[in-house]
Structures are given as structure tokens and as C-alpha cells.
Regions:
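Short, charged/polar, Gly/Pro-enriched secondary-structure boundary elements
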Residues: 63-66, 76, 133-136, 207-216, ...
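Generic structural signal for well-ordered beta-strand positions
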Residues: 114, 136, 189, 262, ...
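Surface-exposed beta-loop interaction hotspot
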Residues: 129-174
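Core segments of cupin and vicinal oxygen chelate
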Residues: 4-9, 15-65, 108, 116-120, ...
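Vicinal oxygen chelate
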Residues: 9-21, 53-64, 77-105, 124-129, ...
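Short beta->alpha transition motifs characteristic of CBS
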Residues: 119, 138-145, 220-222, 289-295
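Hydrophobic, ordered structural segments
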Residues: 74, 90-102, 108-145
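C-terminal functional regions that serve as terminal interaction/effector modules
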Residues: 209-214, 219, 239-256, 260, ...
Length: 295
């Protein structure tokens, strides 16, 4: 069996379930984002059911993106999740150099199957739960030409906005930090903790502090809105993470674009970073906007 370090994992995108993607992409576009790809119909339809409707967007940073996916979905497990949870952050997708070996490795190390390994026309892939139940999709590009397009590193707007990753609320932060290091080959960028709260920044093998500052933040439920969501849904993908050179300006731009205020910029007492929280349009999920941390 291959080791995690041999599977070349990189964090690729977050999938958001939403039934009005054409309308709800506009606040993102007004907030300095751009579309990297739109897949629909036969372009990316790999099953005999449902349909594909995928809008990929990003801003400022290299590689990391979001994908708005609309029903009716191609897979039964997707329709079941939509039935149970509705609008939400469904899964984080990772790219690997060997999807078949990746699934064997993950299932042997605490993950549980959601969608079995399948070979599709342009990629091989599968979906699993991590040990706390959050969805992980893993894909391996197999077509010579097909690949979701990427932005170069170019912080956007006068505020210097970059989408850099996701936060996840965990039931056991330490156990999940250990799991993502050992099983998904992540490494710790920074750790912030007191007697109550723990926040750990992790990244993948391709991290570059200037041009590819992709992060996965693992933490306990700290804010009231996180505690409420955790109580209803359990451990979950809690926020899209942005960094900006000018947080206040980026926050004002977000409000103008149509995002909703959850918390105006203030210094996070744990990390020491100026941080704001907003709700985005695809069901009111959370956006975390912070100044750049330098662990």
C-alpha cells in the first residue's frame, strides 16, 4: 500500500450545493471573483442520471477555488445529502496522482466510503467520509488535456483579496490534526490555543507563503453561529477562508457586493489577526475574512 507522501495530495476546491447558481454567483463576481470553468450538460456528465451544473470561481490566490453545484445531481448520494442538509458546503476536493491507491489508503486509515472508486472519461475518483463524517472527494486527472482551469496568483481589487482555503469545525481537533497530517500528508503552518479554544492552520505539499498560501483550518466551535450549526449538523466544513491586504476595505467591498455581515472586522483574541465573518448567497454559509497570518 502506498504511503500518504507518495500520493501527491493537493487541496483543490470546495463544493457548495445551491439551486440558484446563476443568481447567487453574482455577489461573488461583484466581490472581485472570476469564473474559471462552467461545466453543464454533456461537457461533464459522467452518469446516466441527473445532470451536471458546475460553476467554478476563485479570486486572487493560485489553485484553490469553489464550485457551485446545482441539482438534479448526477449521483444518488448527492441527492440524499441535498435532501437532508440543503444549501451548504458539501465537500472539499483533493487531487492525487493515484486515485485507486488513494482510496485503498484512506479506507485502511479511518475513512468510510460514500461513493466507490470509479473511472470516468476525464478523471478517476471517489468520495469518503473523514473520521468525523465530513466529505472528502479525491480525483486523479486521466485525460491528456482536461483540467479545471486555474488563476495565477494575483490578489484582487484595491483590498488585495485572495481565496485561500477552508475552515472545519471538529469534535476532536487534536485527533483530526493528527489524521490530516498522517493520512492526507498535510503539515502544520501555525497553532493558536488557550484553555478553551484551538485553531490549527495546515497546508499541503505545494504550499508557497507568497504565491500559493492554501490552508485547511481545523478548530473547535468558537463563535455562536458555529456552535449552533455544530449542534444541529455535527462536525462540518464551516467557512471559506479569505485573506486580504486591507481587511476593512475587503469587508466593505463584500457588503456592497451582496454578502451579509456576521461580524465586522475585529482582532481575533486567539490568533491576533484582524478578522471578519460574513454570510454568502448560496444558503447563507459563512465566509471568514482575515489579514494574512505569518506563523
Amino acid at each position: 500500500m502506498k504511503r500518504a507522501s507518495e500520493l501527491n495530495y493537493t487541496i483543490h476546491h470546495l463544493c457548495i450545493y445551491d439551486d440558484q447558481p446563476r443568481e447567487n454567483m453574482w455577489p461573488y463576481l461583484r466581490w472581485h471573483h472570476g469564473i474559471t470553468n462552467y461545466f453543464s450538460g454533456a461537457v461533464f456528465h459522467v452518469t446516466g442520471e441527473g445532470h451536471s451544473d458546475y460553476t467554478f470561481l476563485g479570486v486572487g490566490g493560485h489553485a484553490y477555488q469553489i464550485q457551485i453545484e446545482a441539482p438534479p445531481f448526477q449521483f444518488e448520494y448527492e441527492r440524499n445529502w441535498w435532501r437532508d442538509h440543503g444549501h451548504g458546503y458539501n465537500h472539499i476536493c483533493w487531487v492525487t496522482s493515484n486515485a485507486r491507491a488513494s482510496m485503498d489508503h484512506l479506507l485502511a486509515n479511518g475513512a468510510t466510503e460514500v461513493m466507490p472508486f470509479e473511472e470516468f472519461p476525464t478523471y478517476d475518483g471517489f468520495v469518503v467520509h473523514d473520521p468525523e463524517g465530513r466529505w472528502i472527494e479525491v480525483m486523479e486527472y486521466t485525460d491528456e488535456y482536461f483540467k479545471v482551469q486555474e488563476f495565477t496568483h494575483a490578489p484582487a481589487g484595491e483590498c488585495g483579496l485572495e481565496m485561500i482555503g477552508n475552515a472545519e469545525v471538529c469534535a476532536d481537533v487534536e485527533a483530526m490534526v493528527e489524521w490530516y497530517q498522517e493520512v492526507m500528508d498535510l503539515r502544520i503552518l501555525g497553532r493558536y490555543e488557550n484553555v478553551v479554544d484551538t485553531v490549527v492552520y495546515l497546508t499541503d505539499k505545494d504550499h508557497d507563503p507568497e504565491t500559493r498560501n492554501t490552508v485547511l483550518i481545523l478548530q473547535n466551535a468558537r463563535q455562536d453561529f458555529e456552535k449552533n450549526h455544530m449542534a444541529e449538523h455535527g462536525p462540518y466544513i464551516s467557512a471559506i477562508v479569505y485573506q486580504a491586504r486591507h481587511v476593512q476595505r475587503a469587508f466593505e467591498d463584500a457588503l456592497w457586493a451582496g454578502m451579509k455581515e456576521l461580524q465586522a472586522p475585529q482582532v481575533d483574541p486567539l490568533t491576533g489577526a484582524l478578522t471578519a465573518y460574513l454570510r454568502e448567497p448560496c444558503g447563507g454559509n459563512v465566509l471568514m475574512l482575515t489579514e494574512r497570518l505569518k506563523p
